[in-house]
Amino acid sequence: MRLSRYFLPILKENPKEAEIVSHRLMLRSGMIRQQSAGIYSWLPIGLKVLNKVCTIIREEQNRAGANEILMPTIQSADLWRESGRYGAYGKEMLRIQDRQEREMLFGPTNEEMVTDIFRSYVRSYKDLPLNLYHIQWKFRDEVRPRFGVMRSREFLMKDAYSFDLDYEGAKMAYYRMFVSYLRTFARVGLQAIPMRADTGPIGGDLSHEFIILAETGESQVYCDRAYLDLAVPGADTDFRNDAQLTDIVTRWTTPYAATDEMHDEADWAKVKPESQVSARGIEVGHIFHFGTKYSEPMGAKVQGPDGKEHLVSMGSYGIGPSRLVAAAIEASHDDAGIIWPKAIAPFGAGIVNMKPGDEGCDGVSEKLYEALTNAGVDPLLDDKDERPGAKFATMDLIGLPTQVIVGPRGVAAGEVEVKDRKMGERQSLGIEAAINMLTAQA
């Protein structure tokens, strides 16, 4: 993409309404625009990042055996009456009446609808286990939306729902999603720590929040430093191997980790002082087993191997892709702007033509652009006629992992300068050497 043809509305000043780093940088870099309180449009560069996050989530959900569907945003109130939640849900639910005076709602979550889909088609235990997921926009009318897309009223959510014959099957479905989430966050470039969460009236221990450590996090968290050294499950993980999954979950739940709500001082005291990490954290995912909470009132049953009907045991598993984008910025930025992990960077590299109109600079810039494009690097070529300082500031702000600087002096010497955004290191390379280095990383 050529910057001269790209819609990138950069803001020179920090927006006054932005309270945290991610909100400020997303507005400044032209990723999002606020349309009303807690509601945002995603602009081209922001949407590219969001789509990359969703692609990784999809790949890992599919790898774990989940099936993607797409449920509507507008739901019937009748389904929620079946589960008993319509009257219990507060003002955060946006309630709607259509022209036939039927009561509808803008879905804040999808347990009722997915249970209705399941009970309409599945009759036998032989069709289990089953995991259905979708990625869809949701709406919750927060009393005080703040922090940009970190706590917005409209947000994108990946929610998965598992259906099993019994608790043992549901536990393994939970373990599959647990491991899938570890891989998902690692691929996005984040180190997420699973922390035991409240299970409410269901009880048991199958509820975890996935937290990344960040100074601007909303939650106070406590964990054993051992988490920082744990190896994330590899691409060769066999999601059909229950023993392997159980071993991974055991390793990732043995060290101490808790949010402020679940913190236990007695258990915390057992952690060696040098291993104690007390920090702020951001929740980026939540997985939860809720048994027959929805299958019982909605009659979601299957015939078991004993010939009798059994209520299915269910779980839900959520990741907010839009929130995850903001969390990635909170975890990786500096005073100049965003520092994107390579996997979700909007472009693979930025080419900075320091002197558009100069035959040498134009020629080398075009050569680099064509070579990187053909290699699948997806470069952004800054071909705009602006002063060098503004060009560098833009590239640093939008956070592309690598910048290739093409200037008259370098071109005369047959070289370009390559800058690593994260490390800040610069090196001069021959043009072909630079192409080879960047295409090898594609």
Curated annotation (Swiss-Prot):
The keyword Cell inner membrane does not apply. It catalyses: tRNA(Pro) + L-proline + ATP = L-prolyl-tRNA(Pro) + AMP + diphosphate. GO terms for molecular function: ATP binding; proline-tRNA ligase activity. Its EC number is 6.1.1.15. Pfam families: HGTP_anticodon, tRNA-synt_2b. Catalyzes the attachment of proline to tRNA(Pro) in a two-step reaction: proline is first activated by ATP to form Pro-AMP and then transferred to the acceptor end of tRNA(Pro). This is Proline--tRNA ligase. The gene is proS.
